[in-house]
Amino acid sequence: MKLIFAGTPEFAAAALRELIAAGHEIALVLTQPDRPAGRGMKLKPSPVKEVALAHGLRVEQPEKLRGNQEAQQMLRDIQADVMVVAAYGLILPQDVLDIPARGCLNIHASLLPRWRGAAPIQRAILAGDDETGITIMQMDVGLDTGDMLSIHPVAIAADETAATLHDKLAACGAQAIVETLGRLDRIVPRKQPEDGVTYAQKLSKAEAEVDWALPAEQVARAIRAYNPAPGAFTQLGGEPLKLWMASAEPGSAEPGAVVSADADGVLVGAGQGLVRVSVLQAAGGKRLAARDFVAGKSLPAGTRLGV
């Protein structure tokens, strides 16, 4: 099948690799323009661009598609069967959605209609969902409102972080799009249910600051959901302290008060229950397992976090 592929981060790169391996003709790859990154803020290509160039594929990086007649004509000239879209980062107007013979298919990281929007992976963990997955969707101009072509459930583990769930879903999405394209002629699209719609709004750095007055389970989920970005944090002696891994335990203590700090973790009071933080990062330092963190920094019982 002759494809245009549009995507930017590693989530999309996994799908591109799988489509190439499956033998599809990738006539064009669209991805976001190179962005400054790293300490030197040098321009860095997206993961999708790196994969595309490694396989000798044509890459284009328009700043926008809406109203961009030159880019739209370029897409028409390809005469693609399908455009596959995965975390591209640009809005596709109707005149672009109509260009491929069979439209545009999106790889969305949730079981729609739950978690439409920008941050479905993190929002699923924050909400305490047991399951999420991949939806392959026929795109329309709405926010993840198109007809569903296939759904692929993925379990959320008790200790899941956004990083680990991302990798599971990227692998699932890559397999799902190949499978769906392979039986596209036999699929009857299904409307999304009207019940159960939720929206996964974009994450903000402000919401990643830990509120120790919340129940321990909610705090622990937030710490895992914000790993790797934007990174949950609290205050320790006026300095930011990042928290990367945590679980909830029974018990009680003042919210934000350290109960104990040893090789098994830093145990902190919450609004209901205790939070055991097992991976931490002091300002200017590296991520450390609790064992190594407490070996270099004293956290006596009663130390207050968040102040």
Curated annotation (Swiss-Prot):
Q: A GO molecular-function term, please?
A: methionyl-tRNA formyltransferase activity
Q: Where does (6S)-5,6,7,8-tetrahydrofolate bind?
A: 110-113
Leading EC class = transferase
Q: Which domain of life is it from?
A: Bacteria
Per the record, what are the reactions this protein catalyses? Answer: L-methionyl-tRNA(fMet) + (6R)-10-formyltetrahydrofolate = N-formyl-L-methionyl-tRNA(fMet) + (6S)-5,6,7,8-tetrahydrofolate + H(+)
The answer to whether UniProt assigns keyword Protein biosynthesis to this entry is yes
Q: Mind telling me which GO cellular component terms the entry cites?
A: cytosol
What UniProt keywords apply to this chain's record, in alphabetical order? Protein biosynthesis, Transferase
Question: Which Gene3D superfamilies does the UniProt record give?
Answer: 3.40.50.12230
Q: Name one Pfam family in it.
A: Formyl_trans_C
Q: So what EC number does this one have?
A: 2.1.2.9
Function in brief: Attaches a formyl group to the free amino group of methionyl-tRNA(fMet). The formyl group appears to play a dual role in the initiator identity of N-formylmethionyl-tRNA by promoting its recognition by IF2 and preventing the misappropriation of this tRNA by the elongation apparatus.
Question: What family does the database annotate?
Answer: Belongs to the Fmt family.
Return the protein name.
Answer: Methionyl-tRNA formyltransferase
Species for this entry: Chromobacterium violaceum (strain ATCC 12472 / DSM 30191 / JCM 1249 / CCUG 213 / NBRC 12614 / NCIMB 9131 / NCTC 9757 / MK)
Gene name as annotated: fmt
